[in-house]
């Protein structure tokens, strides 16, 4: 169903269900249904004013957008010398099942909502000087009071230039401080004393399966160009080589003592509503949330989510495995298969769904996990 005629012409390009603000999305239409204005409110504080310019109410999903309440990338931040600032926040993978009304923002026509955030909490602002902030993205939309996603609205903010004092920015508490966290499969392959045997076995099995699935997908890339085109929008040899190499790197990283630190539980305390798992790309760490443990070991639904493909998705977010690390430009087969190639190649779900959809060779087994 399409009911936002102002964006119908670009809906095929912005089809991702969830999209991080990104500089790679197509140019915004001149008459945007959703208008976003960035306003400076302090050294590193920003206010985003989101306005519904359309003639119908919008029920906007906040996940992975400028309205996300988690410490995610709300804006792109670029130093005056052209260098993009390191992102130190989280890349959450959200479950799209049973979405509650609380994760939506409802905007009547011409109404606005304000979101205030501090970019210093999730960006490494190590140098004083001028920074340019901008935001682009596609917001999933439900109709009326419903929570079923039926469309997307595109937004592009103004470019905001801010003079930032790095010394003041350094005083802002970071979303993820350097402290000791337990519950990790350590780099020597041992088991942390706080990681229960049950959780250890669940994650170890999922890693083994992810390694097998990603490796099989990597080896099969060259054998079916049309299947590759289905997921990545191209059969360019360089793109196929890149995906094959990345899938093999993901397979090799799906181990206890590899480049990724796999945690047994949410020792960072960021498993908020509908978060399945999340990655800290600046630290190459992955944290599972309770929805992860209730996923199938192997799903019998084509292109569906299970434990191994969730770990493949998270591995693609880690710069120790994939450079540049993948973002979340879209979730789900219907959306990722319509991304333009440059976004598909940098979208974590394209890798996990491609691997699961084509090379998932195991019988389905549903395991409901007990946290004890």
Curated annotation (Swiss-Prot):
Q: Which InterPro entries match?
A: Fungal_M35_metalloproteases, MetalloPept_cat_dom_sf, Peptidase_M35
Q: Name one GO biological process term.
A: proteolysis
Q: Which residues bind Zn(2+)?
A: 313, 317, 328
Report which reactions are catalysed by this protein: Preferential cleavage of bonds with hydrophobic residues in P1'. Also 3-Asn-|-Gln-4 and 8-Gly-|-Ser-9 bonds in insulin B chain
Q: What class of enzyme is it?
A: hydrolase
Residue positions of the active site: 314
What is its cofactor?
A: Zn(2+)
Major site of localization recorded for this protein: secreted
Q: Name one Pfam family in it.
A: Peptidase_M35
- From the UniProt record, which GO molecular function terms apply? metal ion binding; metalloendopeptidase activity
Keywords in alphabetical order? Cleavage on pair of basic residues, Disulfide bond, Hydrolase, Metal-binding, Metalloprotease, Protease, Secreted, Signal, Virulence, Zinc, Zymogen
Question: Where is this protein localized, as stated in its record?
Answer: Secreted
State the signal peptide span.
1-19
Which pairs are disulfide-linked?
195-264, 271-289
Q: What does this protein do?
A: Secreted metalloproteinase that allows assimilation of proteinaceous substrates. Shows high activities on basic nuclear substrates such as histone and protamine. May be involved in virulence.
Q: Which named protein is this? A: Neutral protease 2 homolog MGYG_06241
> From what organism does this protein derive?
Arthroderma gypseum (strain ATCC MYA-4604 / CBS 118893)
């Amino acid at each position: 169903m399409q009911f936002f005629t102002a964006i119908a012409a670009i809906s095929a390009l912005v089809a991702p269900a969830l999209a991080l603000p990104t500089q790679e999305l197509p140019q915004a239409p001149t008459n945007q249904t959703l208008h976003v204005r960035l306003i400076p409110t302090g050294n590193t504080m920003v206010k985003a004013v989101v306005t519904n310019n359309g003639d119908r109410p919008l029920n906007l999903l906040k996940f992975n957008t400028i309205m996300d309440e988690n410490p995610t990338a709300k804006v792109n931040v670029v130093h005056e010398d052209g260098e993009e600032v390191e992102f130190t926040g989280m890349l959450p993978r959200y479950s799209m099942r049973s979405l509650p009304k609380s994760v939506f923002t409802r905007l009547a026509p011409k109404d606005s909502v304000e979101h205030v955030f501090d970019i210093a909490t999730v960006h490494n602002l190590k140098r004083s000087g001028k920074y340019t902030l901008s935001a682009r993205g596609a917001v999933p939309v439900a109709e009326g009071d419903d929570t079923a996603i039926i469309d997307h609205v595109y937004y592009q903010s103004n470019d905001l230039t801010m003079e930032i004092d790095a010394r003041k920015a350094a005083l802002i508490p970071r979303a993820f401080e350097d402290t000791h966290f337990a519950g990790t499969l350590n780099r020597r392959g041992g088991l942390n004393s706080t990681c229960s045997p049950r959780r250890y076995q669940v994650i170890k099995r999922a890693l083994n399966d992810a390694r097998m699935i990603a490796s099989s997908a990597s080896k099969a890339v060259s054998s079916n160009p049309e299947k590759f085109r289905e997921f990545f929008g191209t059969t360019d040899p360089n793109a196929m080589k890149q995906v094959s190499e990345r899938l093999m790197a993901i397979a090799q990283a799906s181990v206890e003592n590899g480049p990724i630190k796999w945690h047994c539980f949410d020792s960072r305390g960021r498993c908020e509503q509908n978060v399945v798992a999340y990655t800290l790309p600046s630290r190459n760490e992955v944290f599972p949330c309770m929805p992860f443990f209730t996923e199938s070991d192997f799903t019998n639904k084509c292109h569906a989510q299970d434990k191994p493909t969730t770990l493949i998705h998270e591995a693609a977010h880690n710069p120790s495995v994939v450079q540049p690390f993948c973002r979340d430009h879209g979730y789900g087969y219907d959306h990722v298969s319509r991304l333009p190639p440059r976004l598909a190649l940098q979208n974590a779900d394209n890798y996990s769904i491609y691997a699961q959809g084509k090379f998932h060779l195991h019988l389905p087994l549903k395991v409901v996990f007990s946290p004890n």
